[in-house]
């Protein structure tokens, strides 16, 4: 079947430019105004790094940043482990009794409203506190557990899609040569799905760092995450420190994303070369 001819129209370019402008112009304005010396975020008064200094001297903001980064890193790591296990069970173990129910329970958080998830987890923690005395109070631990709950679903979907694309002949050949299933997974399967694991980890980290609704339900008075602090601040007006913080986050996310993309692309190319070399041999 011949490919359909590409219809060149100026309207397509206009729509594309408008779409990118709508997406990235606010970010550009945010970065520019983070260097504004004025206290009023909408009034330009000259270039300055004043608000970056104020940001690092704000103990409440730095505490919230540290808490959010810690929770996000720990939640993403646990979600990557649990999501990998869940994906292997869904894809490699095939049909078993209760497989449909298992897959539904793993992926249900994807379509569950955050309000429902947060409220249900709050009721669970309260009930456990009355029944067994744990958790004694809500804070970093309960936020971490809540984030692991919904992040695992996203990681499982990412990794399961990668597992379905793999050529199982290499795994079967290794088992024919006497390798145990556990050794095959760690030596062959895991390196091949590592780009998906890294992608799932980054996705879980971003979702955890960005979460406001669920964390608001399961946190206590002594645990304030960065989205909660920013949300409470902007309700009384945008603080220029928030512009500086958002600019730093954009920069870090961009650098980390580029490094992850580069490493995954290089790993994937090396994997393809190794497979081709093995088939020639």
Task: Give the location of each predicted region.
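Generic hydrophobic transmembrane alpha-helix motif, especially the helices
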Residues: 105-143, 154, 195-199
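Short membrane-interfacial helix/loop motifs at transmembrane-helix boundaries
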Residues: 4, 25-59, 124, 219-221, ...
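Transmembrane alpha-helices
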Residues: 14-15, 20-27, 155-160, 166-167, ...
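Interhelical loop and adjacent transmembrane-helix boundary motif
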Residues: 3-8, 39, 52-61, 209-262, ...
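N-terminal signal-anchor/first transmembrane alpha helix
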Residues: 1-29, 102
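Membrane-embedded alpha-helices of multi-pass transport/permease systems
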Residues: 25-28, 32, 81-85, 119, ...
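C-terminal transmembrane helix and the adjacent membrane-cytosol boundary/short C-terminal tail
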Residues: 2-14, 88-90, 94-98, 160-175, ...
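Transmembrane alpha-helix signature in integral membrane proteins
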Residues: 35, 59-90
């Amino acid at each position: 079947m011949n490919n359909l001819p590409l219809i060149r129209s100026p309207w397509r370019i206009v729509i594309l430019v408008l779409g990118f402008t709508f997406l990235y112009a606010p970010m550009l304005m945010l970065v520019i105004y983070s260097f504004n010396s004025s206290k009023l975020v909408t009034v330009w008064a000259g270039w300055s790094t004043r608000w970056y200094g104020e940001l690092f001297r704000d103990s409440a903001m730095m505490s919230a940043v540290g808490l959010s980064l810690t929770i996000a890193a720990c939640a993403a790591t646990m979600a990557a482990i649990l999501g990998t296990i869940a994906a292997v069970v869904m894809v490699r173990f095939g049909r078993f009794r209760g497989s449909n129910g298992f897959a539904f329970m793993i992926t249900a958080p994807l379509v569950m409203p955050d309000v429902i998830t947060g409220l249900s987890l709050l009721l669970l923690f309260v009930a456990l506190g009355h029944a067994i005395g744990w958790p004694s109070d809500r804070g970093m631990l309960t936020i971490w557990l809540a984030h692991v709950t919904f992040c695992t679903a996203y990681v499982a979907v990412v990794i399961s899609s990668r597992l379905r694309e793999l050529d199982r002949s290499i795994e079967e050949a290794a088992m024919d040569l006497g390798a145990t299933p556990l050794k095959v997974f760690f030596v062959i399967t895991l390196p091949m799905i590592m780009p998906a694991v890294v992608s799932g980890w980054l996705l879980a980290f971003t979702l955890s760092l960005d979460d406001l609704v669920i964390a608001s339900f399961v946190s206590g008075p002594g645990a304030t995450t960065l989205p909660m602090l920013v949300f409470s601040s902007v309700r009384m007006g945008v603080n220029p420190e928030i512009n500086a913080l958002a600019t730093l986050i954009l920069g870090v996310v961009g650098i980390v994303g580029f490094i992850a993309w580069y490493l995954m692309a290089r790993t994937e190319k090396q994997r393809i070369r190794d497979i081709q070399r093995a088939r020639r041999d």
